[in-house]
């Protein structure tokens, strides 16, 4: 995108600076904290750091995932950890298989949501399109949107009918998008804690434009078909 900007070529989605902010999940969470947007307590680590439970900045249960990457790679039934041995094992596994540092967050046990974003590049107005992502219970009794569930398309995506939650998510998603200096369109993910309070999880300022979460957020909120979505993204990118 930098090359396109330098050469005055129009493009869709955000610039390189914004993409770098959201691609590192810890960096994105720090930006949210500065913007007073709630996100779970966290730290980053890799094998050899935080060598015992006393060195842990936050207490169990925790959620362990790669600090970068998409499609829930590195996330499975063992991502929720309740003790130091399982934490250590998961951190090592991510380093070995994903070649990544880990983002370790306080585990949030509530519902999962994603909010599609359209920003009008002329007026600056932002449209938020919340959806709920429902996942079946795994063998450990948890509802985790893991790699296999995404790969096999086993999750269920539904409209957010609760007006209070819809409005909460819409406001937070818009604030998050602005904090990351997003352009044109994107997607912001949230998860509830056990009390039903939404927490920022991560952002995707260049979401896939196949029939994934962004498309489904357009369909469920705007009754927009796939062709209409593509034309809107393209037209907006040309302004």
Language-model features and meaning:
Residues 1-23, 38-41:
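A short, GP-enriched loop/loop-strand-helix hinge that lies immediately N-terminal to
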Residues 4, 31-33, 219:
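Structural element of the ATP-grasp superfamily
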Residues 13-14, 71-74, 154-157, 210-215:
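Short small-residue beta-strand/loop micro-motif enriched in glycine and branched aliphatics
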Residues 19-105, 109, 121:
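Active-site nucleotide/adenylate-binding loops and adjacent lid/helix of ATP-dependent enzymes
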Residues 36, 163-239:
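ATP-dependent carboxylate activation and anion-phosphoryl transfer catalytic cores
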Residues 47, 120, 136, 206-208:
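Short coil/turn motifs at secondary-structure junctions
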Residues 83-171, 192-199:
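Phosphate-binding site of ATP-dependent enzymes
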